[in-house]
Amino acid sequence: MLVQPIELITELYPEIVGEITRSNNDEVISHLKSAEDFIKGYLFKYDLKALFGTTTDAPTIVDESLKKCVKIVASYWLVRKANPNVNLDQFKNDWDFMIGTKESPGWLIDVKNGDINPEWPYKPDDPLTTDIDESEIENPVFWASNKKRTNSF
């Protein structure tokens, strides 16, 4: 897991997390995992094992913006469940800044669209992919153009 439950203290006070989850650490872990899975959906073209790690290996790329994004998503989902003494507008603003919408894209959507280019590794090429020249495959689509003509008047 990229973000551990103790790291949520940058977004929410521990006593607030304890009140929301009723001190159930498994619920915090569940929110963090679902936030990571949500973000992985946006970052499909990058090497997710290098960015997020696996259950046995730690991530090889450490990016604080990515960790911040996971924490904001998980925190937003936690405070939506119950918001004891929490300003939801602040979390909505953080969500809009990090995730955004189609009309007003945030950091994560800009990374997905290629407007922001973090120096993350792309997925490795699949070695089972064959080197087929797709232009030589019989295809129902036919590309052609008329011969160029020179007209003199």
Put a short name on every predicted segment:
Residues 7, 27, 34, 65, ...:
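Exposed alpha-helical structural elements
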Residues 39-42, 46, 73-85:
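Amphipathic alpha-helical interaction segments
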Residues 76-153:
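Short loop/turn elements at secondary-structure junctions
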Residues 64-73:
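Elongated alpha-helical scaffolds
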Residues 1-64, 125-153:
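Conserved short "hinge" loops at termini or chain/domain junctions
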